[in-house]
């Protein structure tokens, strides 16, 4: 692996040389994962400093809390404090983008199914970074239920899957008043299709199946409308946590568990992304920085960046990985990712005339939601005598 040599600096003070040694050590450790000795660092681009001088800097940096020594004769490894100094040093630098844009294909996407696009984009980012990815999105309006599917869980419960025109998927667990056969489930799904499309009439339904179908249809419509109207949290997409298993840093199950607890906490994920969107710039949290977002002290790092619709921040995307991350490369990749999805989402929002909105605390229906309830596709059927 090629070691990035530091730029020679003339007439620098002791503090500047100490900082240069620290950044060089962190850079080398990120690339190799091995403790760094004075001779090793000297050969990695610090030929202008003697090994004794480097050891003196190591001792000073260790005393200041930036380095740890694994054992008396071993090299040093960076602490979370050192990672923060390193990440901050390169946060706003203009690192070159990859020669081949891994997100170039995003620009050819043309569809109103923006939710599907954002999920696929998150998957691609996870693949490129080997990190877990979480992404927030506004609510895209003028969306309608396109399909309803049923999956029996047991004799008394059924999982109802709601799919919309924009690719959003919601699930609801419903109680079954009667036991249904697989054929009965299919007939009820056909009933849903007929009601949603207003094409034809449902056929071959048994009386008890029709009762269940009508009840489920009415209940699912109301649940969807209430959830659609009472938009108090951004939509959150998460993927790629299994990729963290490939990091040697997470071979310790306790470290992995603390990171998993953070990743599975949707509220914490939303808070991190909300802060990034509000600040409107690339942001990072390392180690104890995340303590306020978790019950324990996660031994991991989170990097976030906002994305835009017509230059207005509407959401953010985050990476979760170990503290030993290639921050310089990931900062550059995140900026490129944000640029690409911002361009693609903006283009499709305008092309398909899609409105969007941010979460609100109000529980009252707006005029648009009142009109939505009146749409013919959402008419609730009541066949009671």
UniProtKB/Swiss-Prot annotation:
<keyword id="KW-0805">Transcription regulation</keyword>
<comment type="similarity">
    <text>Belongs to the HrcA family.</text>
</comment>
<keyword id="KW-0678">Repressor</keyword>
<dbReference type="GO" id="GO:0003677">
    <property type="term" value="F:DNA binding"/>
</dbReference>
<comment type="function">
    <text>Negative regulator of class I heat shock genes (grpE-dnaK-dnaJ and groELS operons). Prevents heat-shock induction of these operons.</text>
</comment>
<dbReference type="InterPro" id="IPR021153">
    <property type="entry name" value="HrcA_C"/>
</dbReference>
<dbReference type="Pfam" id="PF01628">
    <property type="entry name" value="HrcA"/>
</dbReference>
<dbReference type="InterPro" id="IPR036390">
    <property type="entry name" value="WH_DNA-bd_sf"/>
</dbReference>
<dbReference type="InterPro" id="IPR002571">
    <property type="entry name" value="HrcA"/>
</dbReference>
<protein>
    <recommendedName>
        <fullName>Heat-inducible transcription repressor HrcA</fullName>
    </recommendedName>
</protein>
<dbReference type="InterPro" id="IPR029016">
    <property type="entry name" value="GAF-like_dom_sf"/>
</dbReference>
<keyword id="KW-0346">Stress response</keyword>
<dbReference type="InterPro" id="IPR036388">
    <property type="entry name" value="WH-like_DNA-bd_sf"/>
</dbReference>
<keyword id="KW-0804">Transcription</keyword>
<dbReference type="GO" id="GO:0045892">
    <property type="term" value="P:negative regulation of DNA-templated transcription"/>
</dbReference>
